[in-house]
Each structure stands twice: as structure tokens, then as C-alpha cells.
Swiss-Prot record:
Allosterically activated by GTP, when glutamine is the substrate; GTP has no effect on the reaction when ammonia is the substrate. The allosteric effector GTP functions by stabilizing the protein conformation that binds the tetrahedral intermediate(s) formed during glutamine hydrolysis. Inhibited by the product CTP, via allosteric rather than competitive inhibition. SUPFAM superfamilies: Class I glutamine amidotransferase-like, P-loop containing nucleoside triphosphate hydrolases. Catalyzes the ATP-dependent amination of UTP to CTP with either L-glutamine or ammonia as the source of nitrogen. Regulates intracellular CTP levels through interactions with the four ribonucleotide triphosphates. One of its GO terms (molecular function) is glutaminase activity. ATP binds at S17, I18, G19, K20, G21, I22, D74. The active site is at C382, H507, E509. Mg(2+) binds at D74, E144. L-glutamine binds at Y57, G355, L383, G384, M385, Q386, E405, R462. CTPSs have evolved a hybrid strategy for distinguishing between UTP and CTP. The overlapping regions of the product feedback inhibitory and substrate sites recognize a common feature in both compounds, the triphosphate moiety. To differentiate isosteric substrate and product pyrimidine rings, an additional pocket far from the expected kinase/ligase catalytic site, specifically recognizes the cytosine and ribose portions of the product inhibitor. Pathway: Pyrimidine metabolism; CTP biosynthesis via de novo pathway; CTP from UDP: step 2/2. Residues 1-270 are annotated as: Amidoligase domain. This is CTP synthase.
Amino acid sequence: MVHLAKYIVVTGGVVSSIGKGITAASIGRILRSYGLSVTAIKIDPYLNWDSGTLNPYQHGEVFVTDDGMETDLDLGHYERFLDSDLPGEANITTGKVYMSVINKERSGDYLGSCVQIIPHITDEIKSMIRKIADKSGAEVVLVEVGGTVGDIEGQPFLEALRQLRNEEGHENVMFVHVTYVPYLRAAGEFKTKPTQHSTKELRSTGINPDMIICRSEMPIDSSLKRKIAHFCDVEEEAVVNAPDASSIYEVPLVLDSERVGDYIVRRIELDVDGEADLSEWAGIVESLMIDEPVVTVGIVGKYVELEDSYISIREALKHAAAHLRVRVDIEWISADDAVNEEDLSRLDSILIPGGFGERGIAGKLEAVRFALENRVPIFGICLGMQCMVIEFARLNGMEGANSTEFDPETPYPVIDMMEEQKRIKNMGGTMRLGSYQCRIREGTLAHEAYGTELVGERHRHRFELNNEFREELESKGLIISGTSPDDFLVEMVEIKDHPWFLGCQFHPEFRSRPNRAHPLFVSFLRAALERSR
């Protein structure tokens, strides 16, 4: 039996970073509350094959999926809002599309045809979208088109999606256009002209939006909605206002109050019983809005100027705080600078996130030393764990201990590149990526947090604790609390006689959800709360 999905395509206009990803994720959350199965796709119109080699300052965090793909951070939003694990193929890039088409041409699949944008590229885009829809078995497929309408890079994707609507039927595909309605304080009024022009640009591609979601700093009134409906040729009830919210998790509630779910259900003829029920989600949002007690976490990182570089860590801390019914305040501390001990002393806890390269390592090591000497709860993730091992070794007689990533000639290479990684020359998609199992040692902080002996966590690294120094480090007091099931790779470390000192080689933040806070983050914040008291 052929799987027939309904498609909701989300495009953006006027400005970039308008919140298309949160909008798409919020629509998905609303549809989930009807009892519908939903999956999501992010289209990134850049020529990179994936997000793995992109600069965090330009693109934000690289989100790693269970199956080991390095993807756009919007997939993290989708997973958190939909509470489901997405495949890496749900991130479609121009690079993937072109590579697939060129490989097919080289293998003779096109039988000598002149390979063109239309039909070959557009057919490949549609094929990728349908493949994801079929494999997921979802009733609704959300497709977010990255960038802004009018970008030259996005034109083949918009054409493919226009064709998709014709082929699937207008009752099975709808377009949601997210725009910005600026407020001019000098004139004291909102301006709809940018939205009108953006919609006109979209219509010039052959796509008429079914719904327009207007982002704004403040709520807009019904007369403005009528004006936009009139000039943009959509129904008045399909003009939706999404003003700035205090939390991204409020957006599904805002859109639901605008009857977005009801309109979508009617527009693409979804088979549902009853109304959307977001009561559980509203409870989560209420927990996220708690004002006190407050715990302070200092994140010592090298990309702190752009918070999106650590977006999953930030959200995981919020989820854990909501679980404990506390508020978390995050202090962003640049590891590039000499870490000020006075600043650190005001913190309830310290978190050292992942990263690559030598820049900022000295600052991270200073933070580890401060946490050890002052008994401050500290959580190290990926490179953060490696820094904890390095500083622990140095403080316990292994002078000059380091990672071979930073000092190939170190006398104590306590962190070294994994053996199988040493033969790899290409950078893209070649690390230890995706979900791997970790066996947890009983009687440890990790076991207390997880409450189980075997867990699956997502990884993204080339370097590991060097087994040649494992026995020596353990003799000095380092506890290996988690390893690969074969006991070969060290996954987690702790020490005794410290309130909370734990490092993990994996990225637990990728598994945290608003309704299911990650146990390590909950345990970490609980220790921070104890210190704050």
C-alpha cells in the first residue's frame, strides 16, 4: 500500500533568522497534540554536503543525529518539540542533491540526457523528500526551506516544492510563509509593505501561500491582519501573529491561540478527532518560567559570543531546571581570556562544552583547576572531559600532560587520537559519529544519575582517553565510570571526594527533551542547587 502523507512547507521572507525553525517545530507540536504522527525535514540551500565543517560562529551548533549525521541545529528544535529522533537524511542540502545527481550521471542513469536543474535536480529533491516521508510513515511531513525567498540558492527547491504540490494534490500540500512586520517607533505604527513584497516574491515562483505567520516585536491588531489578507490574497483567519515570546517553548501555545491547528486540519483535510490538547505542553512551559530558586552555571567555551554554538546545552540546562523547578542563569565565559577566579567564585557550577583546536584550552584548564581546588560542581562534555583528564593528570604528578591534538610531543599524552582515526585524511563526516552504547559502573555518580547499566548516547569526536595511561590515572584517583561495552573506550570519568566532578566523551545534550530532561543535566543542576544553598 502506498503511503500518502500530507506536506506542510514553511518558507521565510523579509529577513533571515526570523524563526522558521521554531515555527515549523511549533506547528509540529500542535499537530502531535491531535494525535497525528509528524516528521520534519530541513532544507539548507548551501553547497556543503552537511554542517560538519561549518564554522560555529557562522552557522551555530552542529546537531548530531542518532545515525551519525552532522546536521543543522533546527533538527535539534524538531527533535525537542516533536519528542522524536530524526534521521540524518532529514537535513537536505544542495551539496547532497547535486552529488547524488552527478553520481547518477556518472553511472549512466540518465541515458545520455543533458542533465539540467529542471527536471533532474528538482526530481532529485522531490525524491529525497518522498523517501523520508515514506520511511517515516508519518501522517504529516514538515518541510522547512532555509534562507529567504528570493535567494538564488533556494530557487530549485521552491520549484521542486511547487511541482510537489501539483503532483500530490493541493489538498495534500500547504505553504506557510513566515514574514516580519516591523514596528516604526518614529511613526508609531507597524508596516506591512515588507510582508507584501515578500509574498509577491514567493508568488512569482508559482507558489501562493496558504497561511502567513507574521513575526513582530509586539502583537498586531485585527485591522492589520485584514490588510495583509487583502494584499497577499490569503484568508483573514490564515494571517497569524507570532509576537516575540519570552521562551521558544511558548510559541506552540501562541500559535494554538491563533487557531493555527484548526486551520491546517481543515486546509489539508487531516483526519482527527476532537481538538488539540496542549495542556501537558502548557505545564512544561509553566515549569520553564519559574523565577526562583536560581542556580548559576558558568559555561567556559571558545564560541560563547554566539550562544547558538551551544544551543542544545543551553536547552538541556533549561529542561533540567524545569524538572527540578528552579531557574538556571547561564554565565557565558570566554575560554580565550584568562579566567577570572573572582568571576568563577560567584558560580554555583561550571560546564565545559565540546570544541576543537588549541585556542581556549588554557582557559578551560584553569576552570577545571578552580573547580577541583574549590569543590565547585563541574561537568565536562567531549573536549570538556578531555580537559578534566589533562588537568587532573597535571595536578597528580604528570607534569606536562596534554592531548596530542595540542602538543604532539607531550611526555604524558593522556588524550590521543583514536587508532582508526589516524588513517583518515578527509575532515567531513569522518569522526566517531552517532549513537553508541556506554556501560556504566555501579556505585558511581553516573550510575546514580542514570539508574541503569547500559545507555545509548551520541558522539562526535576523534580523540579519546589514552588507554596506555588508564591504569596510572586510576591509581591516582580517577574513576572510569563509563566505557564502551567491550571496555576499550573510556566514555565517562569522575573523582572521589568532590561534590560533583563528571566528564563524558559523548554529547548528552542531544538527547534532552523539555518533557524528559537528561539525567546527567538533572544530577549536575541538583549539585549546583546544593552549592547555592
